[in-house]
Amino acid sequence: MAASAWLEAGLARVLFYPTLLYTVFRGRVRGPAHRDWYHRIDHTVLLGALPLKNMTRRLVLDENVRGVITMNEEYETRFLCNTSKEWKKAGVEQLRLSTVDMTGVPTLANLHKGVQFALKYQALGQCVYVHCKAGRSRSATMVAAYLIQVHNWSPEEAIEAIAKIRSHISIRPSQLEVLKEFHKEITARAAKN
């Protein structure tokens, strides 16, 4: 791993709890500073922040969540979220696609894995909760890929559609680039068929 990658990963770890507290604060405060913990993007996908253990029942019973796509690294979910076994016990399958916080970009392969996972649950009429720490960047990139696949939208159209529902998403230029690659692959595949 390059020195810059080590620094980025270290910075993400140092800032994890302060930025998580900020996310919790924004979820609890009332008024214009309030941010909902999660949003329903369509009939299948919910985009949100860490699914804390106390949210499990609501996600499963009220939102019909049967799949969870975790874009976090292991240390981010260790104490506050369900383990894969705990999700399974609740009737939920977890797919972890670890991506470094703040600077990380989901890989093209992981975007494809995540989209296929969501499509599996879409076919079953069930829902998938896609999350990272705050539900703003890593997970929003994954949801954009899903929308690109489902609607044959451009990356910009997918991001705009998400932002209309969850206005505080933040897709960085490097994440937009991987979405453009994803779109190019999806478009090329569709042209062959």
UniProtKB/Swiss-Prot annotation:
What do the Gene Ontology cellular component annotations say? mitochondrial inner membrane; mitochondrion
Q: Where is the transit peptide?
A: 1-31
- What Pfam families does UniProt report for this protein, alphabetically? DSPc
Please provide the record's keywords in A-Z order. Hydrolase, Lipid biosynthesis, Lipid metabolism, Membrane, Mitochondrion, Mitochondrion inner membrane, Phospholipid biosynthesis, Phospholipid metabolism, Protein phosphatase, Transit peptide
Task: Enumerate the subcellular locations listed in this protein's record, separating them with semicolons.
Answer: Mitochondrion inner membrane
Which interval of the chain is the signal sequence? none
Give the quaternary structure. Answer: Interacts with STYXL1; the interaction inhibits PTPMT1 catalytic activity.
Q: What is this protein called?
A: Phosphatidylglycerophosphatase and protein-tyrosine phosphatase 1
Origin species, per record, is: Mus musculus
